[in-house]
Amino acid sequence: QVHVPLEPKRIISLVPSQTELLYDLGLDSEVIGITKFCVHPASWFRVKQRIGGTKQLNLELIRSLNPDLIIGNKEENTKEDIEALEKEFPVWMSDIETLEDAFAMIHSIGVMTEKEDEAELLVEESIEAFAFLQNLGQGKTFLYFIWDEPAFVAGKNTFIDSMLTKIGFQNACEQSRYPSLSDFKPATVDHIFLSSEPFPFRSEHVNKYQSIFPNAQIHLIDGEMCSW
């Protein structure tokens, strides 16, 4: 149970995607701190206090800002940092594996920040957008690579899998979370997605993966679109 002030005025965001959400909710003056990876919106990145990286938070700097609400994420932030902050400040953590989890997170943050109407509008617009794209994948299979050497993919029970299956693709990886390509042998794959993050796949990687999957279409993809 997190005891949040009725209307928090000093919010710190520990996750880039949730920083964008706070901006979309119109919380410009309320957000006082973001991470060095919170590059969107650019206007905030230029002027907001940066409190370290998602997994290397500057706890002393955070303490000096005296936040009345800290918003983090179970996967992005470390257990040690969060436990330390929870002893001193209200900390709310998201835990997102599916698109539905993301919608629930938007609603919860909207309620906490007195922006419930704005949050509900964002959810409604997102649902409409996904409904429009629901047949984009046409049942084709995919592997979404997040790392190279060793090669890791996004499997089941990940937000990436939820996003792509929602628009009609099928994951060729049946394993959960982020298995190594060496841990399973995929059947025929229609599409290979090489993400821009966390590993920065570039054009020079395309030929390598085309040789591994000669019948697949290889795509360089903006990781922010599938994992933020």
Predicted features and spans:
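N-terminal ligand-binding lobe of clamshell/alpha-beta domains
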Residues: Q1-W228
